[in-house]
Amino acid sequence: MAGRQSGWSQAALLQFLLGMCLMVMPPIQARSLRFVTLLYRHGDRSPVKAYPKDPYQEEKWPQGFGQLTKEGMLQHWELGQALRQRYHGFLNASYHRQEVYVRSTDFDRTLMSAEANLAGLFPPTEVQHFNPNISWQPIPVHTVPITEDRLLKFPLGPCPRYEQLQNETRQTPEYQNMSIQNAQFLDMVANETGLMNLTLETIWNVYDTLFCEQTHGLLLPPWASPQTVQALSQLKDFSFLFLFGIHDQVQKARLQGGVLLAQILKNLTLMATTSQFPKLLVYSAHDTTLVALQMALNVYNGKQAPYASCHIFELYQEDNGNFSVEMYFRNDSKKAPWPLTLPGCPHRCPLQDFLRLTEPVIPKDWQKECQLASDTADTEVIVALAVCGSILFLLIVLLLTVLFRMQAQPPGYHHVADREDHA
């Protein structure tokens, strides 16, 4: 009986000690989402331009060329709804201005896409309704003039070094072979469209126009057969590779997509060291923006980013306090976002590894790296000459000042004290 009581007392003591340990031990922090960056393409739009023989000119489109359509508005509203569901519990259910910052390129279609997206992401709560009959609230979208945009409008320029890389790309076997293989096809398309000097780099305009017209139920001309449109689509994808790859992809990335990636990484690093807002940073831009970024990350799938597609960066704080980055690409509204893996890192990539692996494509000084080698040398010589000239000028001025003062002194001048000493 005494042994049983002793056993019970030992068990009670162990339970008591365990409870005390749990009370004094710091709680284990669960893995948590800390920050999200989104880059999405605008929604469905009208063609950017028509070709000379196009039966559908600008007056065919309600708002003219390059404008967001009702379909595009709906695509982004639905994306906003999907994001609202994905980040339920992370973002406030109602719009809170300190949680969200949105920047767009200065195009009607990207600005309107961002607004439609925000309408789906943050429908007004009862207290936010300014009119009971309108289920919408204004949310700010920021932008800069196109001529000043050095973040989202690609390709970035002017950049002589990038243009030099493009000229080198035109001399590669891949580009040359593609030109030879498609020479007759390009001539045929040029003849049917009335376009002059059609190249691998400009053919995408023809595909884009036909794609927009076909998407909106317009009858294509007889020459634009399914086989022709498919061939145009393949050349259009090649034009994206030409812009950001094929030749010296890392150097191109430093001058193009790496600029945007640098800003994204700067924001991720900042959010890992502070609890400041915002929680969500959104960029509304173009297919070229997405391709430039994904080529810099080396995760591009070789296909044009569809309307309202969205590249997602999620910053997590792990239960051990460290930070990790996960990437996703939503390019199909009927499927969950596709996980993207940075080469050399698992999908849940530690932030420090993410920064290290992307360092080769991050420019140190974009303006300087954009200069040609001869321009850089000339600039250094000019600066050196300017410095030497300035120093020489100052020495001459100083010398002239001394000489002037010496000549200004009267020749018979003596101190009074001297006169008294020799009286």
Swiss-Prot record:
Stretches that traverse the bilayer: 381-401
Lumenal side: 31-380
Organism: Rattus norvegicus
Topological domain spans for side Cytoplasmic: 402-423
Main location class: membrane
GO annotation, cellular component aspect: lysosomal lumen; lysosomal membrane; lysosome; synapse
One Gene Ontology biological process: response to cGMP
The record's account of how the chain is modified after translation: The membrane-bound form is converted to the soluble form by sequential proteolytic processing. First, the C-terminal cytoplasmic tail is removed. Cleavage by a lysosomal protease releases the soluble form in the lysosome lumen.
Listed EC numbers: 3.1.3.2
Cysteine pairs bridged by disulfides in the record: 159-370, 212-310, 345-349
Keyword field contains Disulfide bond: yes
Localization per record: Lysosome membrane; Lysosome lumen
Membrane topology, record value: Single-pass membrane protein
Cleavable signal peptide: 1-30
Protein name from the UniProt record: Lysosomal acid phosphatase
Enzyme class: hydrolase
GO terms, molecular function: acid phosphatase activity; phosphoprotein phosphatase activity; phosphotyrosine residue binding
Glycosylated sites: 92, 133, 167, 177, 191, 197, 267, 322, 331
Catalytic activity from the UniProt record: a phosphate monoester + H2O = an alcohol + phosphate
Source taxonomy: Eukaryota, Metazoa, Chordata, Craniata, Vertebrata
Keyword Transmembrane: yes
Residue positions of the active site: 42, 287
